[in-house]
Amino acid sequence: MNTIVGTYECKVDAKGRVLMPSPLKKQLASSLQEGFVLKRSVFQPCLELYPMQEWNGMMQKINKLNRFVKKNNDFIRRFTAGVKVVEIDALGRVLVPKDLVGFASISKDVVFSSAVNIVEIWDKDLYEKSINGEDIDFADLAEDVMGNVNDDDNGIS
């Protein structure tokens, strides 16, 4: 698993093309040949860009679900709804299909935000609202999520 780092602001053109920021492109260089999967986020009004290797790992996990359990089948259908294989073109751009532009309410300004091993693509205004929102106290969230983690190998502080 490659860890991706950084948050970058970009412009999207009228055709839905976004120039991938150079530092991000360098981090994803090993994935450029294999391509990427672009999908709707489950929890947020943004898109998720998976390097193909990460997507294949996710699909291996999902493939273990019993499809004769209705809940599993419904999840698979919704999780993969609108999924697109995308590539970085010769000019370093990603084409965001119109249905996904609509889902994420992308206008002119977008944010590429690293999320461990994938990249979230947000409309800039929605991104700002999400990280600055008063609906979540980040200190409380950090304590709830990471407060009881006891990682003896790597020493999470």
Specify the residue positions occupied by each region the protein language model found.
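Flexible "stalk/tail and boundary" regions
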Residues: M1-E9, A14-R17, L24-L91, D99-S157
